[in-house]
Amino acid sequence: MRCAPTAGAALMLCAATAGLLSAQGRPEPPETPRFASWDEVNVLAHGLLQLGHGLREHVERTRGQLGELERRLGACGAACKDPEGSAAPPRAQANLVNPGGGDASPETLRSLKTQLEAQNSRIQQLFQKVAQQQRHLEKQQLRIQNLQSQMDHLAPRHLGHEMAKPARRKRLPKMAQLAGPAHNISRLHRLPRDCQELFEEGERESGLFQIQPQGSPPFLVNCKMTSDGGWTVIQRRQDGSVDFNQPWEAYKDGFGDPQGEFWLGLEKVHHILGDRGSRLAVQLQDWEGNAESLQFPIHLGGEDTAYSLQLTPPVASKLGATTFSPSGLSLPFSTWDQDHDLRGDKNCARSLSGGWWFGTCSHSNLNGQYFHSIPRQRQQRKKGIFWKTWRGRYYPLQATTILVQPTAAS
């Protein structure tokens, strides 16, 4: 009987499967910021399926060979144990398990039986490993189906009614929806870097969009489309639903509801503007229904400069640039826990409220405390939302909006 080749094949199969499972068992490396393409996912899935089918076919062939050996050994054992003496002659018995001729001694039979048991054990192990591999393939298939479902969900369309927009203009209703599909779409389509780029691509409807400035992960912004381009809304005050007396980290990362009151975040604004020429627009509203708008050419520094804001005289307003500070002066951002204002004797953010480019505390503060009516006491009013050169230092405004727009390529 020729068991050695079969045993060798089984051992080789076992080693190959063990190697495969060893590679599979390694911890997955940290997720990188790039997703594999759909073609690469298909190639990987096809390769895994082919490998699983090959393993199964090899095991089935080996099992069939071992089954034949077991049948012959069983027949030989039955003939040797026949009490009536009707067993075949010793040579015929040996030929049952050794068709090539030669004597099969009891030691040979015991050796064959030991080999058969060992190979049966290995076969069982192989079947367990193949079953494990099959489960892994099924999980991979589920992941592929999930990816396909997400791709279908992110087809080029608007949320409600517009079906002909490019996929990278995908709109989402809530900031929380950035997790999951929002990151996937950035791997499938290049997202716009700001609202102005959306405008240049033909978008004319204001609303919530995903953008991805250079060097930044994707995030949700509120875009306002006007006749002179797309503006990114970075702040809105309207009803006092959000507390703006926040620490430095909150002003850095952003807070609030992008469909209501919110602060986008200094780091996000810095990524949007980058080193490009930019302008900042401020929209103000008082309690009598009057409104005013201003625009400033600006440059916003990074965190190493405390997000310093440098501005020059306004380009579209009857109000003076002294609302912020003397023209050309660079003002760092301040909060109650990080004081960067120009006053050496006090912390403007603690004395007033909220975080802002305070300067000397007296020019403006659009992140101050929100009042639903004008307080009678002056000490209270100074903590409110104010713009000194419009409605005065002690008039708390009803609503404000701050927007930014790049004016030149980087």
Curated annotation (Swiss-Prot):
Residues 81-106 are annotated as: Disordered. One of its GO terms (cellular component) is collagen-containing extracellular matrix. The record marks R171, L172 as: Cleavage. It is found in: Secreted; Secreted, Extracellular space, Extracellular matrix. Glycans are attached at N184. Disulfide bonds join C195-C223, C348-C361. Residues 107-155 form a coiled coil. Residues 186-408 form the Fibrinogen C-terminal domain. GO terms for molecular function: enzyme inhibitor activity; identical protein binding; lipase binding; lipase inhibitor activity. InterPro entries: FIB_ANG-like, Fibrinogen-like_C, Fibrinogen_a/b/g_C_1, Fibrinogen_a/b/g_C_dom, Fibrinogen_CS. Pfam families: Fibrinogen_C (PF00147). Residues 1-23 form the signal peptide. Keywords: Angiogenesis, Coiled coil, Disulfide bond, Extracellular matrix, Glycoprotein, Lipid metabolism, Secreted, Signal. One of its GO terms (biological process) is triglyceride homeostasis. The keyword Secreted applies. N-glycosylated. Cleaved into a smaller N-terminal chain and a larger chain that contains the fibrinogen C-terminal domain; both cleaved and uncleaved forms are detected in the extracellular space. The cleaved form is not present within the cell. CDD domains: FReD. SUPFAM superfamilies: Fibrinogen C-terminal domain-like. Its main location: secreted. Homooligomer; disulfide-linked via Cys residues in the N-terminal part of the protein. The homooligomer undergoes proteolytic processing to release the ANGPTL4 C-terminal chain, which circulates as a monomer. The homooligomer unprocessed form is able to interact with the extracellular matrix. Mediates inactivation of the lipoprotein lipase LPL, and thereby plays a role in the regulation of triglyceride clearance from the blood serum and in lipid metabolism. May also play a role in regulating glucose homeostasis and insulin sensitivity. Inhibits proliferation, migration, and tubule formation of endothelial cells and reduces vascular leakage. This is Angiopoietin-related protein 4. It comes from Bos taurus.
